[in-house]
């Protein structure tokens, strides 16, 4: 939790859990995974909304894992605004952040998976996103308002 800096098992009543949730841990086959949110990643020199690490709860070290570039599996941008009029602006800022992430890792000779999650995706930006997905520039994109897409995104992360 944000308050105690300790790992907790999931409570039965998860109402309002997002206020204290900083990271989620699980085991995928033989791999340990941590999905964390809103962390400053030093190599990128910026806060990143969605961060997936290859590590255990102990290895996470209350977020110190951000300095271990080889443990970072995926970084993603989350844009929650639902106003279609602002969707294009969200994509522009999100895409700029994702480009910054890829460039920072490229300077270190590393590849990084990236994702874009948004509550509003309009036609023009959908075409740009699709082209990036086809080229492999962007690893995954999803619309938060489409349940099937959100489930697919969660499955992609879980199986990473």
Protein language model regions, located:
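Catalytic core segments in nucleotide and nucleic-acid processing enzymes
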Residues: 7-160
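A structural/positional concept
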Residues: 1-2
